[in-house]
Amino acid sequence: MDCPHQDVLHLIKYFRKEWPVVSDSERTTICGADNMLLTLQLALAEVNKQNGKEFSVSLSDVLLTWKYLVKHKLGLACEDTVVPKDYADIQKTYDLFLKNSNSLDLIDIYEKISTAGSSEAHFLSSEQLLDFLTNDVCLSEGTDFPIVSTPCKNNLDTVKVKPTLKRIFLAYLNLLVNAKNDFALAQVLNCPERGLGREAFTDLKHTSRLKNMSIFLVATSFIRTIELGGKGYAPSESDPLRKHLKGLSLFVHFIDRLNEIFGETHDPRTAGELLLSTIKMHLIKGRGSGDPLSEAATEVAQDLDLRIKYLINLVSEDKSSGTTGISPVRPKIRAINRGTASGGRETIKTLLKLLDEEAANPPSKNKADLLCADEENTLFGAFSLFTLFRSPEQTGSSPKALSQRVQKAINKDKPKLKHNLIRSQFACTYKDSNLTQTKQWDFPSMSQVPS
C-alpha cells in the first residue's frame, strides 16, 4: 500500500457520495483513528465504573483491547486469541458512544461500503485497514515525523500548543455540522473559560441521559426555556443547570453567532473565513498581540482557512472539467440544511470535507501522549475528554474518592477517647453513677460488714 492515507480518504469520499444508501444522515461525522482510541478509553473506564470500580483504566489495557477491537470488527481475530475481560460490554458501550454522537468510525465506513456491494471497497482490504489503524504501515522513504517525548507535568510548550488549538477549532466546526457530537462539545464547552468545568459537564451529561437528548440540545433548550418560556415554563429552582446559567448562556449565544454566519453569508469562502476569524477572536479575547497563544491561534486559523479555500477550488475545478451540457441533478430530499440558503449548505459540505480529511489522518505515534493528558494543564480552559467524562459525583455503587478513603482509614486506627457527658453547666450537682458505684464498694454499709 503506497499511500494508506489517500486510500482511507478515498473510502470516506465514496461514503459521502453514496450516503443515502449507507447512512441515515448526511451530517454524520467520521471518527478517525485517534478519536476511536479515545472513545475506547472512555468505554473501558465506563465499564469499570459499572462494575463497581473507579472510572479509570490503565494504558496497557487500552492498547491491548484496541488491538483486539480492530481485529474483531474487521473479522480478522483468530480463534485462539485471548478475549479481553468484559469485551462484550466494552464493545457495546463503545458503539453506544458513537451512536449517541451521530458518528461512525473508519471500520464502520468500510463495512457499510462493503455490505453495499461497491467495488470501491476493494481499493482497501481489511488487512490494509488493520495495518493503518495499528500503525503497522510501510512508510515511504523521506517521511519525517516530529520527535515526541513522554508526557510531563509542564507540557504546554510551543510544539503542543498548535495541535491543541487545531483540535479546538475543528471541534467548534464539528459541533456546527453535527450538533449531536458530545465529544466535540466536551472539547469546547469551557473554551475559552466560561466557568463550565467538570461539575457543569457532569450536570449536563446526567440531564442528557435522563431526557435522552444530546448534551448540546440540553444546554440549548435550557437557555431557550429561560429566555422565551416565561414563568410557567421556567425550570425549577432545584434544576442543577441553574447554577451554570451564566456560562451556558455565553456558550449557546456564541454558537448562535456562528450559525448566523451560515444564513447570512452565501459565499462558502467568505463564510469559512468569518467562522475561523470569529472563533479565533473569541479564544484570544483579552490577550495582547504579542502573546504566544494569540500568535499560535492566528497561524492555526490561517492554515485552516487556506485548506477550506483549497477544497472549494477543487470542487470548482471538478465542476468546470466535468461539464457535459446536462442539467444538474435535483437536490436530494434528505439533503443538508434543506430549509436554509444554498450558500449555507455549500459551507457545511465544505466543512464536512475538511473534517473527513482529518479523520483520514494516520494514528498518533505516541499513544501515551494521546491518552494520558495532564489534568492540571489546560489551554484556554479546555479539559481532556477523560477528565470531563470522569464524573466528580459518586454514585451509590462507586467507591469514594481516594483521599476520603485514606482519611477514613486513619481515623479508624486512632484510639478513641472517652469523655464524661456534661449534662449542664451545673454538672457538679449531679451524682456520677460510676463514682457512686465505686464509693459503694469502697465504703460498704454496716449490713455488709461480716459479723
Regions found by a protein language model. Give the residues of each.
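Conserved helicase C-terminal RecA-like lobe
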Residues: D2-S451
